[in-house]
């Protein structure tokens, strides 16, 4: 939390498999530790989201054998060969639940309080009365632990249950942060995540999209529709390979700090230094975008303020491009007198820029400029 506060971050997600939340989708064991963490975070003006959904449940939950007693009402069993992302089924599951159980995430603890133990989970049925149990659990977490929101990793929750969850969360902040793994492959149904989750988008606040998205190989149109969240009114973040900051700035996206490449704070600082919350974003698709690159493979998004603007460009082409950005001053709102590359940590070296002489962008490379009146 101290690190997050030092970087100016305002939300922290507590993932399962950690000392504060050791068992997946069951944050009801280390409750005192979790509560103390949430209270300390609040002191630092940071909200805490906890990993909590219903797709799978842990063998450590108090109700695990009550689930078994209900037959197939709660536990989802495979039909035919089935499929599991994990190779093999833990012996504990087959011993107590039979060969048709569907294994899910598992964590083997190598140190700490639970050293030598394992968090073994199994898939449960969607749209069962377990959804009611989940909502009551969420209400308890808000009233007794003080969490600000939840982090869900994909989901089997339907629209009605997510809407109910949102109403419960509204008591204390209301954030739902959702991660999506790329479902456009056979074992995941070869489907678009945006299509899959369209009905719950109105209740989400933040997206993290996600494993399996090779950002540099995707078209700008695909990124807009399937990754950015913009058509649904949601903010998104990148994951795979640490993301690509210059692509991200075309869509107001950033990497997520603390996962993979730790460069997200450099973009956060750029946003703070520029005052991006007071700007108007005009994406490369916007009819009133004041910047034209003159090259269809080089896209530019502009963040406008009175007397200054950020111009964010990325070359989607396979070859270097030489461009001379054409700026429509009537759309920009001022006549730019200076242009420079802001220094952005490990992402971009600072320096002067001459828009009249043109700029070179390497293949799959980007640049961020700031212009001022």
Per-region residue spans from a language model:
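Active-site-proximal loop/turn and secondary-structure-junction residues that shape catalytic pockets
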Residues: 18, 54-58, 155-158, 182-184
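A cross-family glycoside hydrolase active-site/sugar-binding cleft signature
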Residues: 14-15, 49-53, 151, 177-181, ...
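Active-site and adjacent substrate-binding regions of carbohydrate-active enzymes
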Residues: 126-182
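C-terminal beta-strand-rich structural cap/linker in extracellular carbohydrate-active enzymes
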Residues: 350-373
